[in-house]
Amino acid sequence: VDLRDPGRIELLTKLIEKADILVENTKPGTLTRHGFTPEHILKINPRIVYCAISGFGFDAPSAGLGAMDTTIQGLAGIMDLTRVDGVPFKTGMSIADLHAGQFALFATLAALEYRDRTGQGQVIDLAMLDAASWVTRTRWNSDPNAGQEFRVLACLDGHVLVRIGGDTSAAARWNDAEAGMALLAKSTDRQSLVRALEEKGIDAAAVKSVSEVLADPRTRERGIVFEAEARDGSVWNLLKCPIDL
């Protein structure tokens, strides 16, 4: 709908009157300039769920700025977590775009449920920066030890991730044995160490490279990796959407 055409204003109004959901990802203020403030949208249709996805949110100082996934990854600290040779690097997946969309979906579904129970619509102000910043959190509750329940051990052929448990006693037992475990790991390959730990009832997993993941039988069996032929005849390993209906 091109809102620069006055006739389209009436069209959008009629669409809002009948719609359950309105989703838009224009710069904040775009709809407002044409009279479609959140308040006016709810006045047109009190039951509508209006979800606005933007880079920085309705009222932020940077609200009027455009936002791209890479920009948000830098501002949210994601690129600081994914350094390559010490240099901040964008994740392969457009994670800021993806998570903003996912959170918008969850919020919209929750708002629809609320609407069905109360008859009241909702305005969802969802910022990409908020969604991307949320991804960087390393602890998931107020326990100062909660982020310390995993350890990474260096092996002959890479690294192994070990879960030591979230309670204080488990952490204490691990601290007593950690030096010996680290020494043992240095002389052991990942597969042998993981097997030995699992036999003792300890959760462990090899930390794999992307190339190893693509070749992993478990990944292949699930069909998440598939081969596709390019126009030049070359064959590429690609990843399909994990949703399989």
Across the structure, where does each feature detected by a protein language model lie?
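General beta-strand structural signal in soluble alpha/beta enzymes
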Residues: 24, 52, 206-207
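A structured beta-alpha segment of the ubiquitous adenosine-cofactor-binding alpha/beta core
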Residues: 1-43, 186
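Alpha-to-beta junction loops
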Residues: 18-19, 46-48, 199-204, 219
